[in-house]
Amino acid sequence: MDCFHYPLDTETLLRKKRKLRRELLARNPHPLHKKIAILGGSTTNEVADQLGLFLLQYGIEAEFYQSEYAQYWQDAMFGTPELDDFHPDVIYIHTNWRNLTALPTTADSEAAIDAMLDEQYAHFETMWQALEQKFACPVIQNNFDRPNFRLMGNRDIWDPHGRSNFISRLNQKFYAYAALHEHFYINDIDYLSADYGLTAWGDAFFWHMYKYAICLDAIPSLANSVANIIKSLYGRNKKALVLDLDNTLWGGIVGDDGVDGLAIGPEVPEGQVYAEFQSYCKALKSIGVILAVDSKNDEANALAGLNHPDGVLRPDDFVAIKANWDPKDLNLKAIASELNLGADSFVFADDNPAERAIVAAQVPGVAVPALDGAENYIKTLDHGGYFEVTALSKEDLKKTELYHQNAERAKAQAAFADYGQYLDSLEMTATIKGFDPLYIQRIAQLTNKSNQFNLTTLRCSEDDIRAMAGDRNDLCLCGKLVDKFGDNGIVTVVAGRQQGDALDLTLWLMSCRVLKRGMEDAMMDTVVAEAAARGVKTIVGHYYPTAKNAMVREFYAQYDFAKTAEDADGNTEWTLDVAAYTPKHPHMKIER
């Protein structure tokens, strides 16, 4: 649906929201269900409606609680039976500068202004702490947009008496809090309002007539921003950017114009535009976005273009390069298969609207933004929010390296007729241990990013993981896999709750990067051995179907679990007699 891509079609989003909701639900009949509490300092009805639409686009169906008008602080501090019973998964605090109860004047001393700043900050900090203590869920807080006038003109931003200066300092306090609290996220309306246009954003008509903090047409942009944070928290980010070459990464057609005739680099304005776009793509790679090429070109010409002396990207920046004359939708499907990623993990960037239309029609789930003018490429991708970062792990920083190592493994496999011999040749070592504090962030990230090899899709915060690790009744294991090509890092997580002589497995997931290497066998052998050492006689596993995890539907059957229950939705329960288990002894060394 093009209305959700930048630039947003606000008229369609606002006027046809019911129709859009029906279409989104029909397209995704098994969404992830989440409860979102909106605590507002202004009217929030349209905010909830638009946020619900954007989340549905990401496969998340939201149920909303909304505070009464301007009762955000009272609901947070004193509670309401409705909010308490709601048990939110996420809390969004929708406030702006109009909710400040004091602002400096030219008559105030600097000491009085500092005290005022501390008082305004404390108003919010005590609220955040109360919400954390009561609900222990992610909190998304707007920072502050700029006020509707600058009393002192340009001096307003640096003079302590200026409202602009005061709000900037207050925002900095919010950011310092966010840096220290893992469940706390800033929705940057200071940026959004500047990008939208501050005068239109803060149109006072909507405040005085309807008590909307921002103009009606800006609400979809606000909702998109909040939705990007939430979908990132629940593993719905895109993971890969697939790029065309000619007139996408450089100006011109390399097969016709030759490498010397391409527009790329500092010599001409057009070349500067494409160099800047390549720099942006390389920056995306640095935060864990994997890059690939899908271009109608001879491979030799494509590689020559990527080695242009004034280019920023090089062939080794990409995990896959499909430069041929095959249909681009088939190339993209091949890339997805090679990387073990679903099509909905990809963004496809191509200057040609015909190619975009074919890919969008033939590869459901892929995001296909409308690139219009090379000078707008960065803005279009950046405003799309496809790669919103809410956490950044060491594995993210070396994601391209990990995929290159996988390519080396695939090449090595071709030399073996026997798959077992190939696995032996990898010289793998699995390190399986409890939830080590060093890996808490990565474990939590895996629970929120892994969708395909994930039996229960239980999503956990870092605090959730710490709580499991500290409970003697919980069996918690994570696995790291190293081979001769490199270190894959933490790639699998298992957790279960022991009750008497039974162990109930609540979490089992694995990164698809290590599929078919025996890591799941190593984990199962270890789980059963650990369970037996604890006196467990029966292990119970669960499979909860989603749109993405069909590959593990019969996972437990492979290990001689017996299916003991199945409901109408396909949720299954499996049971193993520990004494009857036969270890798998995978092709790797296992260290504890």
Where are these regions (language model features)?
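A conserved beta-strand-loop-helix scaffold within acyl/acetyltransferase catalytic domains
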Residues: 431-511
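Extracellular glycan-modifying ectodomains
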Residues: 1-242, 249-250, 255-261, 354, ...
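Substrate-recognition element of Asp-dependent hydrolases with the DxDx(T/V) motif
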Residues: 272, 276-307, 321, 359, ...
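Conserved Lys-Pro-Asp/Glu-containing loop-to-beta segment of HAD-superfamily phosphomonoesterases
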Residues: 332-353, 359
